[in-house]
């Protein structure tokens, strides 16, 4: 259904697709508009299902000044509700836990069951009847759904269903069986930068050569273009890349998969570059799949994914969530604004286990500063750039970001979809634009965004 709407003015709007005004990344006015029109209307990853495995388990999701309880009920159903007592507004939960049967307000003892229904009001007769309506004194529900091993919430009760809001990323990542991934570790960082700057560092490949030079496979593919291809050197370079990614991310490419690659290092490959590369990936993908299936792991058919062009996806779900699967495992990122120039970034390293394996319940991590020496090398390199960028944007000589039409196309597309939300466009006018950004950001050019 098409709704009547009146476009609202946007401060510092993107008027030229490849130029983003600098004020978008530090203006309080712009930040407040995002809180009102973006974060109140979009689907957000609230927690992993692993965080609430048992009846009564709950997690607390915070976005700006809004707090949401996500709970698995005794009936197995997952619900979300605003984390505020209906009496005088006290937060009911400040950390994840298990509520057994009910939530109790620590101030005056109002009680709520796992569905949010009010079960007790002390001195009930002292309240006027108009303050005791059953719906009014129950916790306000929040729209929620599950996908990809996570619970998602949307503060807008009129928002369209989750699945249609996160395509085509959902279908692509379903092929990778991301719902079967389980957490190995979960880290969090407090970055002194705007949330958009923080995540845009992971939405383009343009920076890799300078920021992450260790990731550049230096001779092999270049040599192949000049008639210097050597299958042995190619395999050595590929395995070195896997080691570098695995060690640099403390995951993503799992050490188990690197070991599988090492076990086939000495295979014979054709002299023709294209044939050798195809043969290597076929053997490697087959070996990884066979290894994990022998252990009882639910792992996708990597050979089939390669044939379908899905072998190296980077799933992005607007506005704040990434999944980066590689071979058996993956990393995922979530970004949440704290202030115009402060962001919490979280990283999960995930891999596969037998379906009946017992895993510890993930708990929210300590939030590390961006320059903490415990960060793995690759995110540490990104974190070193970001505070300098945030400071540089305040220069009186700098007006706007100049974006590459190809290498940074997703940044432009993202910013213009954001403007659609900030203009107050209804969900049905935003649907097609969302499909342009719920994709692998590394492969996007600047595209026409139509509302």
Predicted regions, residues:
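Short Pro/Gly-enriched beta-strand edge/turn motifs at strand-loop
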Residues: 41-51, 123-127, 314-318
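C-terminal catalytic domain of Rieske-type non-heme iron oxygenases
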Residues: 72, 77, 143-146, 150-451
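Rieske [2Fe-2S] iron-sulfur-binding domain
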Residues: 51-157, 161-175
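Short, contiguous pre-domain boundary segments
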Residues: 7-22, 179
């Amino acid at each position: 259904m098409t709704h009547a709407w009146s476009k609202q003015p946007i401060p510092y709007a993107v008027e030229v697709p490849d130029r983003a005004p600098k004020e978008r990344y530090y203006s309080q006015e712009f930040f407040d508009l995002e809180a009102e029109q973006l974060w109140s209307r979009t689907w957000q990853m609230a927690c992993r299902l692993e965080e609430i495995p048992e009846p009564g388990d709950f997690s607390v999701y915070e976005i700006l000044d809004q707090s949401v309880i996500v709970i698995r009920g005794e009936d197995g159903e997952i619900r979300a509700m605003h984390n505020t007592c209906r009496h005088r507004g006290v937060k009911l939960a400040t950390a994840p836990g298990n509520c057994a049967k009910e939530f109790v307000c620590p101030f005056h003892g109002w009680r709520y069951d796992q569905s949010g229904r009010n079960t007790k009001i002390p001195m009930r007769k002292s309240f006027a009847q108009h303050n005791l309506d059953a719906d009014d004194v129950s916790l306000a529900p929040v729209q929620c759904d599950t996908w990809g091993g996570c619970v998602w919430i949307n503060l807008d009760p009129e928002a369209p269903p989750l699945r249609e809001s996160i395509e085509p990323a959902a279908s692509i990542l379903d092929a990778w069986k991301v719902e079967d991934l389980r957490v190995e570790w979960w880290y969090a960082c407090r970055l002194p930068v705007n949330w958009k700057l923080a995540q845009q560092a992971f939405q383009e490949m343009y920076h890799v050569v300078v920021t992450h030079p260790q990731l550049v496979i230096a001779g092999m593919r270049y040599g192949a273009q000049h008639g210097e291809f050597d299958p042995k050197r190619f395999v050595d370079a590929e395995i070195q890349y896997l080691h570098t990614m695995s060690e640099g991310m403390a995951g993503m490419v799992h050490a188990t998969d690197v070991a599988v690659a090492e076990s086939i290092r000495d295979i014979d490959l054709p002299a023709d570059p294209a044939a050798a590369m195809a043969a290597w990936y076929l053997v490697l993908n087959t070996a990884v799949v066979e290894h994990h299936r022998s252990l009882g792991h639910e792992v996708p058919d990597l050979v089939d994914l390669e044939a379908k062009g899905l072998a190296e996806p980077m799933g992005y779900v607007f506005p704040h969530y990434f999944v980066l699967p590689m071979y058996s495992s993956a990393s995922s990122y979530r970004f949440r604004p704290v202030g115009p120039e402060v962001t919490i970034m979280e990283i999960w390293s995930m891999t596969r286990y037998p379906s009946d394996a017992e895993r510890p319940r993930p708990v929210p991590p300590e939030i590390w500063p961006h320059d903490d020496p415990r960060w793995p090398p690759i995110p540490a390199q990104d974190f070193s750039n970001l505070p300098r960028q945030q400071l540089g944007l305040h220069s009186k000589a700098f007006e706007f970001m100049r974006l590459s039409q190809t290498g940074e196309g997703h940044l432009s597309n993202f910013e213009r979809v954001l403007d659609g939300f900030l203009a107050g466009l209804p969900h049905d006018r935003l649907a097609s634009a969302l499909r342009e950004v719920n994709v692998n950001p590394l492969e996007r050019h600047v595209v026409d965004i139509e509302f």
